[in-house]
């Protein structure tokens, strides 16, 4: 019976790491033997970490896509590589291909569905903060089972995810800064200690006894909060100032709501118009409107009549005509010189005074 219990304990619990697992002591220099693929992955992590840390909120869609890709790829890779799929143990390459395909799908969903992307960003923030708490409490607290670190990870992740959905702008800025700083610290850990700090985190999550950290590991661990604080300040004051993806989403939603209301009003008017019976005409056909009085024409000034010499009877002629009627021809000859200034026609009489006067 004790042998059976010891066998089960050996199968369930991880083996205790030896000195070769943790490398050389702090006083001795490490043997750095880099490989091409891990080094390339760490360089890519460093580049993505810079984008996350200092341009996270400005590259909002890209951050959502990369977060979904990271979650989907890691989870599917662990499931495919550790477990048997269709009663077949997949190789690392096949597991990586499947994980990459499903990770791309998860990234697209996180980018297109904003709430899913924000939930994953907040969940990642909570997981990183829980891991940092486990690392910081290593000299003072040793978990007795794996349920303690697991509960801390799940509780912190769900809490930060819900807070990110409630306050997306500040929590997204904080999450991107912390994630970017963690990626940069991981890349630096590979080139400095061959991921010794990463293995330390894994053993803490498994509740396994670990030796105390070296000063190099503590220096890399202190780099994480410093870069996080710097990333938050840079995004708050420089890169993310003036940008608001929340207002863009709200304006789009308001525009859609306004369009829906307009369409509903048009549909209601159309239904009312169709339901309303046609009215009979109360009067006969209307006569065409009578044309109004024409506009008064422009009254022109009459053309002045031109007068010529001889058109007007001279006063001398009128006087001579009167003298003939009265028979005093002598007065007519005497008055003719005095009336010469008022003549407009000929100065002499129109007809000669020959013969006896004619009575008219």
UniProtKB/Swiss-Prot annotation:
It is a multi-pass membrane protein. Keywords: Cell membrane, Cytoplasmic vesicle, Developmental protein, Membrane, Transmembrane, Transmembrane helix, Wnt signaling pathway. Residues 326-335 have a biased composition (Polar residues). Residues 260-304, 324-360 are annotated as: Disordered. Residues 286-296 have a biased composition (Pro residues). It is found in: Membrane; Cell membrane; Cytoplasmic vesicle. The chain crosses the membrane at residues 36-56, 59-79, 93-113, 116-136, 145-165, 177-197, 218-238. Pfam families: TM7S3_TM198 (PF13886). One of its GO terms (biological process) is Wnt signaling pathway. One of its GO terms (cellular component) is cytoplasmic vesicle. Promotes LRP6 phosphorylation by casein kinases and thereby plays a role in Wnt signaling. May be a membrane scaffold protein involved in the self-aggregation of LRP6 to further enhance its activity. Belongs to the TMEM198 family. PANTHER family: TRANSMEMBRANE PROTEIN 198, TRANSMEMBRANE PROTEIN 198 FAMILY MEMBER. Interacts with LRP6. This is Transmembrane protein 198. The lineage of its organism: Eukaryota, Metazoa, Chordata, Craniata, Vertebrata.
């Amino acid at each position: 019976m004790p042998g059976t219990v010891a066998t089960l304990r050996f199968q369930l619990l991880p083996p205790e790491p030896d000195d070769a697992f943790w490398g050389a002591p702090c006083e001795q220099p490490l043997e750095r033997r880099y490989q091409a693929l891990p080094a390339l992955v760490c360089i890519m992590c460093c580049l993505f970490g810079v984008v996350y840390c200092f341009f996270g909120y400005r590259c909002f869609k890209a951050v959502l896509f990369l977060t979904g890709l990271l979650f989907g790829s890691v989870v599917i890779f662990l499931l495919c590589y550790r477990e048997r799929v269709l009663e077949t143990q997949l190789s690392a390459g096949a597991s990586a291909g499947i994980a990459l395909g499903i990770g791309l799908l998860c990234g697209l969903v996180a980018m297109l569905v904003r709430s899913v992307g924000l939930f994953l960003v907040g969940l990642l923030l909570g997981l990183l903060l829980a891991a940092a708490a486990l690392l910081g409490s290593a000299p003072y607290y040793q978990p007795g089972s794996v349920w303690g670190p697991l509960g801390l990870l799940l509780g912190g992740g769900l809490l930060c995810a819900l807070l990110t959905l409630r306050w997306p702008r500040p929590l997204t800025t904080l999450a991107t800064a912390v994630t970017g700083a963690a990626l940069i610290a991981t890349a630096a850990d590979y080139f400095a200690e061959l991921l010794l700090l990463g293995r330390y985190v894994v053993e803490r999550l498994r509740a396994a006894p670990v030796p105390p950290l070296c000063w190099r590991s503590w220096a890399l661990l202190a780099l994480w909060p410093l870069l996080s604080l710097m990333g938050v300040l840079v995004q708050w004051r420089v890169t993310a100032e003036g940008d608001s993806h929340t207002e863009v989403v709200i304006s789009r939603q308001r525009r859609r709501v306004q369009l829906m209301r307009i369409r509903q009003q048009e549909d209601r008017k159309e239904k009312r118009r169709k339901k309303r019976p046609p009215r009979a005409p109360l009067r006969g056909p209307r006569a065409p409107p009578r044309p109004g009085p024409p506009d008064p024409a422009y009254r022109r000034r009459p053309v002045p009549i031109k007068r010529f010499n001889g058109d007007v009877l001279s006063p001398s002629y009128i006087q001579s005509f009167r003298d003939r009627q009265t028979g005093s021809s002598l007065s007519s000859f005497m008055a003719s010189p005095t009336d010469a200034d008022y003549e407009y026609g000929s100065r002499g009489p129109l007809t000669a005074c020959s013969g006896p006067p004619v009575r008219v």
